[in-house]
Amino acid sequence: MKYLTDIGYYDDILPQKYGFEEMRVKKYDVGDSFDTHIDVSDYASARRWLAFLVYLKDNFSGGETEFVDGKMIHPKTGTVLVFPSLWTFPHAGLPVKSGTKYILTTYFHYV
């Protein structure tokens, strides 16, 4: 974990035991979207610490990931979006305008 100390973070901020949730591939067709939400909303999801979203292709229009602070992530094949899964990061998947969007998602967990 030396790279963390190089940027001013220390091992004690990371959970002592951790793991990843199963990966899911999601398909969004024209008009499909995901309304504004947070990724930790109940007991079952309470162990989520970081969200990972991988854009698997970008030959479609629309489908951006938008955070409520106005930050917009435009899909690009191979890009990995990582952000805290907490209530402080509500976000939405905007509607796909043409083509088909594929993403892979997983979460870093406290165990």
Where are these regions (language model features)?
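Fe(II)/2-oxoglutarate oxygenase catalytic core
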Residues: M1-V80, T88-V111
